[in-house]
Amino acid sequence: MLDLLNKLNDEQIKPVMDTEGAVLVIAGAGSGKTRVLTSRIAHLVEDLNVDPYNILAITFTNKAADEMKERLEKIIGDISQMWVCTIHSMCVKILRKYAERLDYKKDFSIYSETDKDKVLKRIIIGLGLESDKYLKTSKNLISSLKNKDMSTEQFARENPRMRDVTSYMKIIDEYNAELFRSNAMDFDDLLIKTYHLLAEQRDVLLALSKRFRYIHVDEFQDTNFVQYNIVKLLSYANGNLFVVGDDDQSIYGWRGADINNILDFEHDFKGAKTYKLERNYRSTKKILEFANTIIANNTLRKDKVLWTDNDEGVKPELFVANEESGEAQYTALQIKTFVQQRGYKYSDFAVLMRINALSRSYEQEFMKYGIPCKVYGGFKFFERKEIKDITAYLRILCNPLDNEAVLRVINVPKRGIGDKSIEQLVYYSEKNGLSVFDGVFDCDNLDLNAGAKAKIRGFKDIISKLIVAKETMPLLELVKEVIAKTNFMSCFEEDTPENDDKKKNVNEFLSSVEEFARLNPESPLSEYLNSITLSSDTDEINEGEFVTLATIHSVKGLEYRCVFLCGLDAEIFPMQRALEEDTEEEERRLMYVAITRARERLFFTRARSRFLYGGRRATEPSKFLTELSDKLGIVKKSEQRYEQGGYSSDRSSYGNYGGTGSHSGAGGYGSSDFGYKNSGYGGNYGSSDSDYGYSKSYGGYKNNSYATGYAVQTSKPTEKIHSSDLGKFHTGTNVRHKKFGDGVIISTKNNGGEIIADVAFKGVGIKSLVLRLAPLEVID
């Protein structure tokens, strides 16, 4: 045990040795709280001869529980009698033993979220209601009421003006009755029924609280009302409760977590002792300076200041793009530079965002530059249901023979076209050798009643008009027309956070269309669909070696060498909804969590304009950026537009599509706004592919000399394509490249006399090539 203590600092040793009574450890980010927890348990067993049977350690993820078990087994050996588990697992153990006290059988089922959905849908339909309208709110209410230990009667009394409150209460009561009849519990039942068991069955309370002489709780700031009271009851007999948490990392209020559980701990447990772990082992001094500055603006917190003996480090930087595509491209190019020139691995990087809708532009840019990435905190953008639904409509307009697309959206939004009607439609189409869409046009011949036929005919009329519109409407206007004519947004009428996210995803999809149409003004809908299909089908290049794209919530507890925190615009972070609901402090805690994920480098990014609410609009900086810049100042890196030689879009201001090269400082990243004063971005990185016609050098500078546009060596290109042969290369042409292999041209454009082709290569991604220089050949 002495060896273990030697690995702890003075701040950590004190709570480890304080074993009696209630103890609160305020553990700042990266302060070694897991080591403190395991060391304390080891001290109890090894030095104080406490039986592992009498120790309980509660975590809030299975991964954390497994890691703690592994550490403890290495230190003290057999821990089979010790309970080290999540709070839900603990409740299952208790309920299995005492199930009959609650009129359940001990082999009760535990319903998953999918099981819960099926039960609720059946009940809602049985009550003559629409499942799509009531399902999500019913689920949320069930969880909320159970975690607050509130009856439906009490909720109805307190919310008399809530729309359809009576219907919701009927659904919830019937749901709970159905679970009981089925001898089943859902996840929230595991908590609330354990709480009632302990609170109402004194002999059970005494038996369990006497057994667990020493109780440990990790991530205490994330406990809700029921969880907190379970822990409090279990400590009844001995009072030895050791909790570890950080009020500054309480970010799950929307899920029921109550920050007051940790803030009021000393009040609730008289005589409780509090220790602070403020030494950070993760981040540089500069990063911690930003973390301390941002969180100091909160009022609901215990005072603490993180410090470290780590290096001073590089001051975090802010990059301001003209629009979201530039924000993503800047990040991609920075990552490429760090990997190719500074010895970083892709797994060293995380791109963090407040909402997962922002991942779309990053997924596209990363694919383009061959950067492997994995999306957490949501599905990949083009794989999300609402996006797949919209693209299915667009696929039908381009290819009415696409049966899968027709079947996907024939009843989206709900049109009353039921399963039986669809089965009859498919049967008729197959029997007569027709596509499903042809079957839709023959709906009068289907073996259905007049009402069912009329609904299918309505779908046919919508699609027919959109097919006509496709021939004359510009791309962006056409997509907006599809959304309007299909009444697509009615899918998200219910006011829920989930629907808010889906609306934002639809808006982000429109941004993708707008960007494509602007950069490819002559390209039809089919080419746009090709571009996003390639994006959707691209998986990680090297498993385990990828950039993390994630919401901030999903990376809590993790760390990375380099973090890009994107979308720092007003209304996005902090979210407008949070400001309206007076939860700004939780948003600021989320900002703090994001900052403290970074070990060495931290970048903030935002865009001066975004495609929001159906159109492009100017944005304002996040108030969090203002709070940081007012006190610390932020090194600002701002892209600039071309003044000559090419497009004036975000993409061309990176020199992505070539150009003539300029030394005026008007392009590339511009002046000292790039941030690498000792290395030319058009140097080593660009020249490495100079023989392949790849416009990979994106302007930049070296020693205050600036370059825009195409900066690779061009004096002796290998295997040039003769100008007379350029006509062979057009959208849809299959080609072979000397380095990148086989691919297909997905778009071409004329930039200052140079023909630039975007080519999607198998296993590589999309590359922008100067056709005059690229060693390409047409293949069959």
Could you say what each language-model-derived stretch is?
Residues 25, 29-37, 270-273, 278-372, ...:
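Helicase P-loop NTPase motor core
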Residues 29, 212-223, 227, 247-248, ...:
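Conserved Walker B
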Residues 2, 20-23, 28-31, 42-214, ...:
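A basic/glycine-biased coupling hinge at the interface between accessory DNA-binding modules
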Residues 161, 359-371, 384, 391-634, ...:
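Conserved helicase C-terminal RecA-like lobe
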Residues 4-20, 226:
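N-terminal pre-P-loop "Q-motif" helix
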Residues 567-768, 773-780:
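C-terminal accessory regions
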Residues 21, 50-54, 80-81, 116, ...:
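Short glycine-/polar-rich loops that comprise or flank the Walker A/P-loop
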Residues 31, 221-297, 304-309, 427-430, ...:
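Conserved helicase motor core of SF1/SF2 NTP-dependent helicases
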